[in-house]
């Protein structure tokens, strides 16, 4: 039970980082785009490396203890792509205009009165879109932490870093539309709470069926979710903010840091 609460706490911390993003957006006039580019690339490197080197092998190894090795390989692969399919389907629910991947509006808002209604709508829909996306991210953090608390800390920190610019994407249009810092912060903060909510709902649905076999399949799906987030959200957002080579440098360094961390935890 203590692992459950620790995993939930990590998921909550990852989720509320959207609020940190809103505070940063409201406190500073200009976003350091080079830093954001590097940070998003760094996050992608961590998530890609840990998915392929740690989570996928762990899923396959657990399944191999429950069934023939050949069948375990097929099921691990199916779970991985099933996780990708799951978050892709969620992605299709969000119109492109409100999709949180499209965050180029940060720092470029027009404050003309004629824009206020459009900006308000943009902020609300962006908050809703991020809330939808945070459900599977919450599952990824929660089940990673249940499997390995040390790994859960790394995943939670990575997701938290990823959530900061999403918090900015919610706060900026809401603030320019309403001139209310409290409203901008509230929408951003609440969108992040979908992350622990997704973890609680997912755990409640799966708890009656949890076994080493099911848990291994969930981990395979988590790896797929994390790879999708890296390739569909983090790297494109890093490119959107600016310099390609800075993003790639962050990606490589993220992989290196994750590799050293796993070796030290082994």
From Swiss-Prot:
UniProt catalytic activity: Zn(2+)(in) = Zn(2+)(out)
Compartment(s) where it occurs, according to its Swiss-Prot or TrEMBL record: Cell inner membrane
Leader sequence residues: none
Single GO term (MF): metal ion binding
Main location (coarse class): membrane
Residues the record lists as binding Fe(2+): 134, 137, 163, 166, 195
Annotated binding of Zn(2+), by residue: 137, 162, 166
GO cellular component: plasma membrane
Pfam families: Zip (PF02535)
Domain of life: Bacteria
TM ranges: 8-28, 35-55, 70-90, 123-143, 152-172, 185-205, 209-229, 246-266
PANTHER family, per database record: ZINC TRANSPORTER ZUPT, ZINC/IRON TRANSPORTER
Known role: Mediates zinc uptake. May also transport other divalent cations.
Record-stated family: Belongs to the ZIP transporter (TC 2.A.5) family. ZupT subfamily.
Protein name, UniProt field: Zinc transporter ZupT
Lineage: Bacteria, Pseudomonadati, Chlorobiota, Chlorobiia, Chlorobiales
